[in-house]
A protein has these predicted regions:
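N-terminal lobe of the biotin/lipoate ligase/transferase fold
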Residues: 1-134
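Short, intrinsically disordered, charge-balanced linker/junction segments flanking boundaries
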Residues: 135-142
Length: 142
């Protein structure tokens, strides 16, 4: 699902949940897209120009989520939970930590070791060549 279509679906789901509708999780796979969050300076983290990326079919989107720069692409399952944190007595920080714990436990089921870094939000995994990858949670407040 293209990122902008998923974003529109999230906005619609959010409006329904705020109006008292059922909480839900949207599960999607995006074509190649790089999103920038509200944190300034994300462009510095690109290793190619936006022109080079768009020429290769990578969409560039400025989003309203928190954070910096994120790539989504084929083969990645992206989960967008649309929930009422207050109804579950959760703060944003507590919710993020519970997501991290859930991801670590899920990775264990597949024989993958994931860990948290107190200095950086997200779950870190090491590949067979020793490279680290981050699984970041994103949030949007209403």
């Amino acid at each position: 699902m293209p990122y902008r279509a998923a974003w529109a679906a999230q906005e619609a789901a959010h409006a329904e949940v705020v109006a008292g509708g059922e909480e839900r999780v949207l599960l999607v796979e995006h074509p190649p897209v790089i999103t920038f969050g509200r944190r300034p300076g994300g462009e510095r983290n690109l290793i190619a120009s936006t022109e080079q990326l768009t020429a290769r079919g990578v969409e560039i989107v400025q989003s309203d989520r928190g954070g910096d720069i994120t790539f989504h692409g084929p083969g990645q399952l992206v989960a967008y939970p649309i929930i009422r944190l207050a109804a579950h007595k959760l703060t944003v920080g507590g919710y993020v930590h519970s997501l991290e714990d859930a991801v670590i436990e899920t990775l264990k089921e597949f024989g993958i070791a994931g860990e948290k870094d107190p200095a950086a939000i997200g779950v870190w995994v090491e590949d067979q060549m020793g490279a680290l990858a981050k699984i970041p949670p994103m949030e949007r407040h209403s």
